[in-house]
Amino acid sequence: MKICLIDETGTGDGALSVLAARWGLEHDEDNLMALVLTPEHLELRKRDEPKLGGIFVDFVGGAMAHRRKFGGGRGEAVAKAVGIKGDYLPDVVDATAGLGRDAFVLASVGCRVRMLERNPVVAALLDDGLARGYADAEIGGWLQERLQLIHASSLTALTDITPRPQVVYLDPMFPHKQKSALVKKEMRVFQSLVGPDLDADGLLEPARLLATKRVVVKRPDYAPPLANVATPNAVVTKGHRFDIYAGTPV
């Protein structure tokens, strides 16, 4: 995949070249999207809109730390949707990981989560965030046990993941109507990189065959159900719903 690669570390140690080779990235000086290695982290920038700033994965500080410490925990909609109850903490495959926010919430309340991400740039951002998270004294121990990244397309990987998870979680890219600055910034940069998930409808059936208990699909409240398969079961929040489908028991 072609993208502009920029090294701002000043170390001259070739780390960016190693990273590019690992993820199959090819430097393209004219690309509007840039993957930038800074002294702190790896980030994605839209070069023609510098005011949007860089997008990076941060499990340790910022919004994720606030959500972990002061969020709803087990009361969060995504936790309710996957079925967390009492001692039951399902094993989850997040088949559309993105920046890993929902996966992190599930891991922080005790679930084991395997994240699938097919876009190599997004996978590189996730991997960088995980590496910093794993090294953190406060969360590193449980994060290594509970949150993993698999760089693969869900369309193919969902058929051969072992062991089978109890829950498959899907949050396909869907055009957002929200006006919040964060969503607008991230969605603009993200959609410039990966575009909408035009093949997302093809994920529902393999997800239902893989999950032993249920499939959870996060949708904006104005979006039709995935693959136009309606379900009466959903956890509804302001602006979103988590549609719940039966999986395939062992």
Curated annotation (Swiss-Prot):
Organism of derivation: Escherichia coli O157:H7
Annotated positions binding S-adenosyl-L-methionine: 101-102, 117-118, 153-154, 171
EC number(s) stated in the UniProt entry for this protein: 2.1.1.242
Keywords annotated in UniProt: Cytoplasm, Methyltransferase, rRNA processing, S-adenosyl-L-methionine, Transferase
SUPFAM superfamilies referenced in this protein's UniProt entry, alphabetically: S-adenosyl-L-methionine-dependent methyltransferases (SSF53335)
Uppermost EC category: transferase
Gene3D superfamilies with a match to the protein in the record: Vaccinia Virus protein VP39, YhiQ-like domain
Protein name: Ribosomal RNA small subunit methyltransferase J
Listed GO MF terms: rRNA (guanine-N2-)-methyltransferase activity
Primary site of residence: cytoplasm
Statement: the UniProt record of this protein carries the keyword Kinase: no
Reaction equation(s) it catalyzes: guanosine(1516) in 16S rRNA + S-adenosyl-L-methionine = N(2)-methylguanosine(1516) in 16S rRNA + S-adenosyl-L-homocysteine + H(+)
Entry's localization field: Cytoplasm
Family (UniProt): Belongs to the methyltransferase superfamily. RsmJ family.
Domain of life: Bacteria
GO cellular component: cytoplasm
Function in brief: Specifically methylates the guanosine in position 1516 of 16S rRNA.
